[in-house]
């Protein structure tokens, strides 16, 4: 079971705690009574799609009866018992024909939305989250993956193994700022960096210690090879070294090195796109990316990037 499902249980227990408080159960009642009453209230909310949707709608703000009628695609008569049930549970308040959440109703609806968002993210991309090593993501951010919103997993087939990176790079070129964490180097990244810098895009790159040491080794005087296993760059060594130093000296590029803790294979965050690639649970490289364009995902991704940047050191030369 993934680590963040432990937080689902914490969220569930948190919800139970609030419900127990709201129903004014006496402290001297035994635990079975508390659990039974709480579970009954959970059933009242989650086993009714109408009541659940009503709570989520009222979370947006008070609504008149006419607004409620227009919001749902079923007869108003069928909504009356659902509203009455929520009023009886002290989750909804009716004042002069206007319905709103009580204080505890707001608390419960907020936590319910949080849980539903998290479950949706997991359910829609279950293979990605269950088959990859999530330990490189700090737990406080892992518990907030519901903020990623609408995501999709990009899976390159063997005949177009580099197409995913190409598609992501095209989106990056349309951005005004770029943040990248790199745990494995590839010649395509070198070429992409040149394009970013030429387009005056502000670029911040975090390299893992091993990647940085690999680049330094290639630039040693006695080195006679650059990316010896792939000849994409077609650069001689002096030219390659010159371009590496150009990257480091450029005003709109900022480089950092991060050692120690485990990192994602690749993290890309811009003002347009969020993309994340992780090792699988066996420590193997996986070329799949989870991608989102939603504002919440961009913010979440930037927080993850800043987490690694905080524990990194700037570099200006090899």
Question: In which residue ranges do the predicted regions lie?
Answer:
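Short, conserved catalytic or adaptor-binding loops enriched in Gly and charged residues
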Residues: 145, 242-250
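Cysteine/selenocysteine-centered motifs that mediate thiol-based redox chemistry or coordinate metal-sulfur cofactors
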Residues: 302-318
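Amphipathic coiled-coil/heptad-repeat helices and related helical stalk/stem segments
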Residues: 38, 161-165, 189-190, 240, ...
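Basic, Lys/Arg-rich alpha-helical nucleic-acid-recognition elements, primarily the DNA-binding modules
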Residues: 2-120
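Primarily the HKD phosphodiesterase
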Residues: 168-240
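HKD (HxKxxxxD) catalytic microenvironment of the phospholipase D
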Residues: 252-295, 305
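Short beta->alpha connector loops
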Residues: 61, 183-187, 261
């Amino acid at each position: 079971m993934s680590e963040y499902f432990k937080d689902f249980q914490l969220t569930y227990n948190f919800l139970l705690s609030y419900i127990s408080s709201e129903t004014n159960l006496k402290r001297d009642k035994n635990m079975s009574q508390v659990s039974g009453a709480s579970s009954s209230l959970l059933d009242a909310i989650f086993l009714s799609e109408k009541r659940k949707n009503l709570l989520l709608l009222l979370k947006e703000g008070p609504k008149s009866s006419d607004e409620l009628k227009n919001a749902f695609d079923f007869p108003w008569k069928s909504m009356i018992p659902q509203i009455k049930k929520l009023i009886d549970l002290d989750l909804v308040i009716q004042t002069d024909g206007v319905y709103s959440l009580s204080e505890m109703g707001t608390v419960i609806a907020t936590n319910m939305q949080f849980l539903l968002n998290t479950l949706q993210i997991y359910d829609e991309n279950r293979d990605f989250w269950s088959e990859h090593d999530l330990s490189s993501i700090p737990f406080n951010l892992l518990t907030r993956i519901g903020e990623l919103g609408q995501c999709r997993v990009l899976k390159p087939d063997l005949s177009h193994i580099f197409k995913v990176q190409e598609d992501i790079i095209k989106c990056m070129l349309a951005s005004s700022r770029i943040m990248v964490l790199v745990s494995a180097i590839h010649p395509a990244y070198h070429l992409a960096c040149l394009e970013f810098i030429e387009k005056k895009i502000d670029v911040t790159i975090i390299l893992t210690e091993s990647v940085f040491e690999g680049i330094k080794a290639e630039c040693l005087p006695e080195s006679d090879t650059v990316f010896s296993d792939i000849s994409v760059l077609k650069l001689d060594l002096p030219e390659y070294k010159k371009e590496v130093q150009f990257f480091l000296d450029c005003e709109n590029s900022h480089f950092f090195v991060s050692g120690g803790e485990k990192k994602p294979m690749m993290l890309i965050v811009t003002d347009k796109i969020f993309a994340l690639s992780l090792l699988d649970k066996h420590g193997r490289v996986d070329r799949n990316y989870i991608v989102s364009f939603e504002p919440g995902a961009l913010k979440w991704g930037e927080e993850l990037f800043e987490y690694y940047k905080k524990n990194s050191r700037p570099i200006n030369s090899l």
